[in-house]
Structures are given as C-alpha cells and as structure tokens.
Amino acid sequence: MAHIVTLNTPSREDWITQLANVVTSPDELLRLLNVDADEKLLAGREARRLFPLRVPRAFIARMEKGNPNDPLLRQVLTAEEEFIVAPGYSTDPLEEQHSVVPGLLHKYRNRALLLVKGGCAVNCRYCFRRHFPYAENQGTRRNWQTAMDYIAAHPQLDEIIFSGGDPLMAKDHELDWLMTLLEAIPHVKRLRIHSRLPIVIPARITETLASRFQRSSLQVILVNHVNHANEIDGEFRAAMAMLRQAGVTLLNQSVLLRGVNDNAQTLADLSNALFDAGVMPYYLHVLDRVQGAAHFMVSDDEAREIMRELLTLISGYMVPKLAREIGGEPSKTPLDLGLKQR
C-alpha cells in the first residue's frame, strides 16, 4: 500500500477552524478586497436575506483585490439581481424536493443521491439547491441508517452519490461510518462524492480521509466543482495529489456562468489547470433555472458557440461535456453542438 503524503504543516489551519472563520458579511468581504461599494453593490447586500453570504478566507485570498468583477468574487457576492422573479425559473428546478426517504433521492435507475449534509463551506449565488428544504432532510445517523436500509433493499443501485449541501462538511469519522455501511451492501460498487470543499478549503482533504478512501472496497470518485482557473492553487494541487495516491478518481464539473467563465479561452485555461492538477474535466452544465440566479444565465446558442471554439483550443480529452439537468429525466441531457450542420 502506498504511503499517503500528509499535508499537515504548522502553518496549515485545521479545516474546521477555517469553517468557523468564514466571512458572512458583504461589507467585510468587500473591505478585505479593497473594493469600493458603489450604489449597485450596496443594493445587493440585502440579498443575503434570500440566501446567506458565506465565503472561506482561503478562497477570498485567491480573488483580485480592487476588482469588483473578479470571477471568483462574482460567484459568491450577493447581488440585487437575486430579487428578480424571472419567468421560467423555480425554487425547485430539478424537481428534487420529494425524497424516497429523508435525504435520499432515487433519481436514476442504478444511482441514488444521499444528502449527507445540508450546509456548505461556501454559498454560491447560482446554487440550484439554494431553496432546498434541508430542515426536512437532516443529515443524522437515524436518517442515514434509513437511507442505507433503502439502498440495501434495491439491488439495482450500484453507485451511491454523496451530495448536499456539501458531503465533505461531514467529519472524517462520520464519513467512515457511512462508508462502512455502504461497503457491507454487496451490490454497491462505487461511491461518488460531489464537493466544492476541496477547492475552497483544500485543508479538508486530511490524511485520515485519504487513507480511508484508500482502504475502501468501493471505487471512490471525487467530483470537484471548480468554475475558473484562478480558483486552483498549490494547496488544491497538493490535496489532489494525495487523493490520487489513495486511488481516488478525480473529476470536475463546472457551471457555465455569465461574467465568470462565459468564453472559450477562460474554459480552456480551466481545463488545462485541472488536468495539470490531475483532475479530468467531466461536465460543463448550463445553468439550472433556480430563482435568484437568472443573471448568470448563458443562452444555449451562446453555450454551443463557446464550446465549438473551445474544441479548437485544447485536446479533445480535456473538453467537458456540455449538458443540462432536467427534472424527471432519467439522465443528464447533452446539448448538441450542431457540428454536423457546419
């Protein structure tokens, strides 16, 4: 068994300490970045009543000071556009608010999604679950055990997805308990974890967690949620190296966001940075139509044009699949790029 390299150094804050010290005030966030709050930014402060602001300081450190249009800042800063009630947008765009048991969504035939934790380290303003009733789907051992009983009773389920919120908000001992239960179910072969924590607080990838993944009888897949190359730093690359040593398959999915990554060169830079970190670009999602996020929307026609250009900038294996998720559909829906017609 390969030795797992530890990332714990005297200067490295414990991830739980970092969680307790996140920024929750728009005013403090702008002050830390030396951004002068104009009338528009000031008006956006009230959007935290709709969806709280929450940003780890490690993520803020990667933002450009003095730039109100920084692509990382734009993903997390409250905006007055969140008050717009846009036609065609919903508080439940993927029709997820009906669990088979508390916290378990059986959306696809062979896969079920377990909402491990409702909280996140960062609140992304475009989040499609910003209105999700987490209070009714608590991440408790009682609910987790009920979910495991359901999984055990459905032999078609060979892959379980840990989601949230953010599943890595669970502590290492909680994840160990969940994995032990899953490993005892013979028909479950794969564990997929979707998380933004490794990018916003790379210290979350502890030696204990990596070692637990390495010992698992399950195939473990981590799907990172990274939208811009500027998010990727040395700590993230080191965390990914530790997970690769542990045999974890590393993927990434992004959301195509107006004013963040809505051009081909930015997406090419992201794919290159991910690949250099040992992470394979996987999906590029068009925005889920959740109320409060319409200002991030990139049209399908624009998305196709961006993807066609992206194909000319990087190798094909680094091009993510452009897709959307539609409530009630049995899988993600790829967007046809119209290449045959050109």
Q: Over which residues does each language-model region extend?
A:
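Iron-sulfur (Fe-S) cluster-binding segments and ferredoxin-like electron-carrier domains
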Residues: 127-139
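Conserved AdoMet/S-adenosylmethionine-binding subsite of the radical SAM
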Residues: 145, 149-159, 168-314
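Short, internal active-site loops enriched in acidic
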Residues: 167-168, 198, 327-332
